[in-house]
Amino acid sequence: NLFIDDYAHHPTEIENVLSAAKDSKLTNNIIAIFQPHRYSRIQSLYSEFSKCFKKADLVLVTDVYAAGEKNTNSFKIGNFIKLIDKNSKVKTIHIKSIDLISKYFDNNKKNLVIFMGAGDISNKAKEFYNKFNN
């Protein structure tokens, strides 16, 4: 398995990262782990986010890293997941814990796991990498 930690937290960045990963042909299974950053960003780019994961084979979405913001517009992660699944045409799952990621690996494939976001996802990526490789 290969692991990448990327600061991508905007739809264009996410699309570019996944496109480069697909074009690299390093693997035949790309798992995108996305931590949404700020309710205001997700809501203002809701449609764009729903379409930017097309090059992934599986998308795992964590809870929103609020960065001090309140969920004033009643953002629902379940609706966000369904829209990504529909518009990006990729299986999308909400995960509450990074520890659950390996449950989604296909051990018959070489997985490229890309952690993306601007919150504390980098710390979680390091923790997961260390746990997975020990």
Where are these regions (language model features)?
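A glycine-rich beta-strand to alpha-helix segment
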Residues: 99-134
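Short glycine-/acidic-enriched loop or helix-start segments at secondary-structure transitions
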Residues: 43, 70-71, 123-127
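Short glycine-rich anion-binding loops that position phosphate/pyrophosphate groups of nucleotides
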Residues: 9, 36-39, 64-67, 118-121
